[in-house]
Design a protein with these regions (language model features):
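Short glycine-enriched nucleophile-adjacent loop
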Residues: 160-171
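Alpha/beta-hydrolase active-site loop
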Residues: 123-144
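Alpha/beta-hydrolase fold nucleophile elbow
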Residues: 146-157
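Active-site loop->helix "elbow" adjoining a glycine-rich segment at hydrolase catalytic centers
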Residues: 129, 157-160
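Ser/Thr-rich, Proline-interspersed low-complexity disordered segments
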Residues: 1-13
């Protein structure tokens, strides 16, 4: 006699569970044109993640884009209390330096941060922020000025954790820089 056993359900934070999910991303919508940087344009943009409208800061270099598009850095900020988070503040010097070097920089607000929809429930004990970033990667792959084969990530603190998890989940991220 065969005795039925329960099939284990993977925890949503498990890498296998995260790899099994779909991250369709969406078109990137320019919500507002911001003051430009030294050699790049700055935009306040949005994309979709699990049906939520997520906002981001995006820079795009001036000039003629390379034949395959500009390389991309998805920039993952560290923990900032969601109630004081402002899209155009903090990490600006880092974003500026990367943008000046000829990269599209895409800094997501994560759900519940700034004007992004959803609840900010944390990046360590829940998969939500990583899901938002994986949808950002998928959205950047669709962006006409981006090179979908040259997407990297930069992350600080909690953003470093999100960067590492993202790189283990998808091979769409080719390189990562993690700051403690």
């Amino acid at each position: 006699t065969v005795i039925p056993t329960a099939t284990p359900v993977p925890h949503p934070l498990e890498i296998s569970a995260m790899r099994a999910r779909d991250y369709p991303g969406s078109d990137i919508v320019i919500e507002e044109v911001l003051n430009p940087g030294a050699n790049y344009n700055r935009y306040y943009v949005s994309y979709l993640s699990e049906g939520l409208k997520i906002y981001a800061l995006m820079t795009v270099p001036y000039g003629e884009k390379p034949a395959t598009g500009w390389p991309v850095i998805i920039f993952n900020h560290g923990y900032i209390p969601p109630d004081v988070y402002v899209t155009t503040e903090r990490y600006i010097a880092y974003v500026d330096q990367i943008a000046r070097s000829g990269y599209i920089v895409f800094r997501s607000d994560y759900r519940g941060h700034g004007n992004s929809e959803g609840e900010a429930l944390g990046g360590y004990s829940r998969p939500d922020y990583t899901i938002d970033i994986l949808n950002a990667v998928a959205s950047m792959k669709r962006y006409p000025d981006a090179d979908p084969n040259r997407i990297g990530m930069w992350g600080h603190s909690m953003g470093g954790y999100i960067t590492l998890r993202s790189m283990v989940i998808t091979d769409d991220v080719k390189v990562g820089v993690i700051w403690a």
